[in-house]
Amino acid sequence: CGDINAPCQSDCDCCGYSVTCDCYWSKDCKCRESNFVIGMALRKAFCKNK
């Protein structure tokens, strides 16, 4: 999985329960710390391979 600022295609590509795949700033998605830690942890729980 990718660390902060790593390229990603979905939240499941990013390491850490609070790290989201952010496509907002450019067309190149990057992993970044989420402001919604609890919600992200719940979403990450559904990632199959991480």
Swiss-Prot record:
Protein's UniProt keywords contain Disulfide bond: yes
Similarity comment text for this entry: Belongs to the neurotoxin 03 (Tx2) family. 05 subfamily.
Domain notes: The presence of a 'disulfide through disulfide knot' structurally defines this protein as a knottin.
A molecular function GO annotation: toxin activity
InterPro entries: CNTX
Location within or outside the cell: Secreted
Protein name: U2-ctenitoxin-Pk1a
Main location: secreted
Tissue specificity: Expressed by the venom gland.
Intrachain S-S bonds: C1-C15, C8-C21, C12-C47, C14-C31, C23-C29
Entry's Gene Ontology cellular component terms: extracellular region; host cell postsynaptic membrane
Keyword list, A-Z: Disulfide bond, Ion channel impairing toxin, Ionotropic glutamate receptor inhibitor, Knottin, Neurotoxin, Postsynaptic neurotoxin, Secreted, Toxin, Voltage-gated sodium channel impairing toxin
Function: Insecticidal neurotoxin that reversibly inhibits the N-methyl-D-aspartate (NMDA)-subtype of ionotropic glutamate receptor (GRIN) and inhibits inactivation of insect sodium channels (Nav). In vivo, is highly toxic to insects.
